[in-house]
Amino acid sequence: MKQNYILSIILCYLLANVHSAPAIITVWQTVTDAQVAAGPTAAAPAANANANVQQAAAASAPAPAPVASPAAPAPASSAPQSSTPSSSGWLSNLFNSFFGGSDSDSSSGSDTASAAPASTSPQSSSSSSSSSGNSFLSFLSGLFGSGSSSSTPSSISQQQQQQQGSPASGSNSPNSAQPDAAAASNPVPQSNNNQGSGLGSGFGSGFGSGSGSDSDSGSGLPSASSSTIIQQQPSSSNIGSSSTSSSSSSSSSSSSSSSSSGDIYAAISQCDGIDASFASEILDAHNKYRAQHKVGDLSWDVDTYNYAKNNADNYDCSGVLTHTHGKFGENLAAGFKDGASTVAAWVDEPISYSDASFVYNHFTQVIWKGSTKVGCAYKDCRKSNWGLYVVCEYDPYGNVIGQGSKNVFP
């Protein structure tokens, strides 16, 4: 009676834990997964555990189903396999184990548990103490030995093939492709100025920076970023007139339109919309004063004229004189009746020939030896009581700090 009571309790316990059987098989999967993760050194414990299971199964079942060799287990990243062991195999082993008293090795559960690494999936404790002792271990052996589990060698073999055929991690992943290092970049427009060494050393204190990409007149010509200018507006002897001069930031290339034969007027006829009489008059006025200071004549130039004309055409006749800070030397004036009187006003400024006290102004630009070409234009502002607005551009530019004594003579 007592034996039947104990048997009933054990049977109820086992029936209540029938659904734990897949979890026990998951423990075996974890063992084989650990072998994949740890390499050949982890294969020995898994093999020993499997040998113990097969040894215990041999005592209770004459023809156990083969178990896949741990030498080529399923990949560690594979999902747990669904396993539905048949009740005809393990249930008969259950009764045989209770009534037959199999002497299986009690270390199989502990070996299995010790070989299994820490896992994030919950596992049943196969090594816990049980009231059935060795009989319960025989029950475990029956599960592995004679059950017709769906985790067949063929399914494990397919997983082995997938593992062998899969590429190495990250070796062929599109995400590992590096972006093209050659990033397209927009080129910065280059200014076509040729600065001399004198500009870099000059235009120090007392002079404002004249950098800028466009002139106030709307000119689209490029300008250097390191230009410096002289911003002075001395009053002229004529009432209501004012003038200002500028040294631009860069020297321009020689204009092909300038006369190579020495005819300083040749380029006048090549200019569009020009007042030829005004051009000849203002050119002569420049060269008159240059001759007095022992420097060569200026020649009329198409490029400087076009630049000056663009400035003059966009002037608003306000009487405010604003330099364009372009690539040429520049003199401005407003309130005069013609070109000759304009140049006379520029020349009527004080001048010093000493390096220590040299003054850069309109006058020094007019007679600057290094400047060889000029182009001038005007806008009629007499309706606004400002006479003619006159613009003259010089190439190469003058008024370079530190170069005064080499370009301006008594």
UniProtKB/Swiss-Prot annotation:
Induction: Expression is specific to in opaque cells, in presence of lactate, and during hyphal growth. Expression is repressed in response to alpha pheromone. Residues 148-179, 212-260 have a biased composition (Low complexity). GO terms for cellular component: extracellular region; extracellular space. Residues 1-20 form the signal peptide. Residues 197-211 have a biased composition (Gly residues). GO terms for biological process: sexual reproduction. SMART domains: SCP. It is found in: Secreted. The keyword Secreted applies. Keywords: Secreted, Signal. Residues 283-394 form the SCP domain. Its main location: secreted. Residues 64-86, 102-132, 148-260 are annotated as: Disordered. Belongs to the CRISP family. This is Secreted protein PRY1. It comes from Candida albicans (strain SC5314 / ATCC MYA-2876).
